[in-house]
Amino acid sequence: IEELERAAVIGYKMHTTAMILGKPGVTEKFVGGQVSGIASSYGSMVSFPTIFSQHGEIMHGNPSMAVLEAGRLALCDCGAETVNHYCSDNTRTFPVSGKFTQKQLEIYKVVEECHDAALKLSKPGVKYMDVHFAVCRILFDRMKELGLAKGDTDAAVAAGAHAMFLPHGLGHMM
């Protein structure tokens, strides 16, 4: 448990560093490098190559020399691996300017609703795929409300259309 907590605490420090440094005028590569260095500074290593990008729509994109811009969102996906190989892995998206635009906030609230629904639905005996598809239906309904999707929700989810918004699926398998 202590090793898991250590990995989580270091991962938390990595993310807060990204939020502090991820301001307009700084490059993605600079922030990504500093974030990775946090793991080393605590005697750990990164659990996978740090992802830090304004292009969160590109799954697993590497930090580039792109300069962070006001009004954009930055995605940070990082984690630490302890000497005994326990890992953390968290993804956070935050506004480079420090404040969400109205549309960004609306979408952030949808993600928050999906997160909360997943927590509420996840119980012993409930299948992962049942939770996954329930969240996908909520997500697709909310995207329709925001004018970002249209059509019958059940049919869209059955056809995989929700993956435009959730390409990775709901979490990682353990």
Which stretches of residues belong to each language-model region?
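Active-site neighborhoods and metal-handling regions in enzymes and metal-associated proteins
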Residues: 1-174
